[in-house]
Amino acid sequence: MAMWLDSVPQLKSLGVSNAEIAELTKAHEAGMTDPSSVVLIQLARDHKTPFADGQSVADLLNAGSSEETVLELARLNQLGLWAGEARAMRLAGLSDKMILAVARRRSQGLPVLSGEKLGELKNTGVTDAMILQMIQKGDTDETATKLIAQLERAAGGHRFVYQAHAHR
């Protein structure tokens, strides 16, 4: 076992494989704490799969997502392939709250805006509160495209990028 894992007896009792240790090491090196590492393994056991999302966890943490957000994504079984989109959303300035709202809808099989459209909404100057409301209502990419077009027309027909801080 990796040296840091020797100090986490709960992991030994969960029968962690060498492959899972390698994945946990990636997450740990990105800042995942020991107690959360145990939770990740327990969640993988609950989903009856080996833990294989260490790189996804590391990428999300490195993009600025909180450990709590990563654990909630794991609870929702939304790490895996979707974690890349969640990471891109985070890097585009979307909050963990928005990412979790999208993940909850995805986990329930409900319609949800794509990460790309959410980023466009953010860049067009739509407030976080309005974006969150659109996610929770189940607005589609088509609805978002119409809103973006309206906002661009109102701005004189130009695509523009919202900047939170004026540069002089």
Language-model segments: which ranges?
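General marker for long, soluble alpha-helical cores
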Residues: M1-R168
